[in-house]
Amino acid sequence: MSISVNCPTCQTKVEWSEKSPARPFCSERCKLIDLGEWANEEKSIPGEPVVIANDDYNNEESDY
């Protein structure tokens, strides 16, 4: 018996097996769409933002 999941991008049923190399996505296209949404900050993990203090870092003096 195989398990099926919905593609997070398009909701198409995807068999959870070696036959579906892009799982949980139905395709590489849906995988890249999801990656783009994270990169554009359209998706995020819920919770309070974390502020990382670093006294050695000064944005104005950075060479990068």
UniProtKB/Swiss-Prot annotation:
Keyword annotations of the record: Metal-binding, Zinc
Region Disordered, residue ranges: 44-64
A GO MF label: zinc ion binding
Keyword check for Zinc: yes
Positions with a binding annotation for Zn(2+): 7, 10, 26, 30
One BP annotation, GO: regulation of DNA-templated transcription
Family affiliation: Belongs to the DNA gyrase inhibitor YacG family.
Function: Inhibits all the catalytic activities of DNA gyrase by preventing its interaction with DNA. Acts by binding directly to the C-terminal domain of GyrB, which probably disrupts DNA binding by the gyrase.
HAMAP family attached to this UniProt entry: DNA_gyrase_inhibitor_YacG (MF_00649)
Description of how the protein assembles with itself and partners: Interacts with GyrB.
Name the record gives this protein: DNA gyrase inhibitor YacG
Organism from which the protein derives: Idiomarina loihiensis (strain ATCC BAA-735 / DSM 15497 / L2-TR)
Gene: yacG
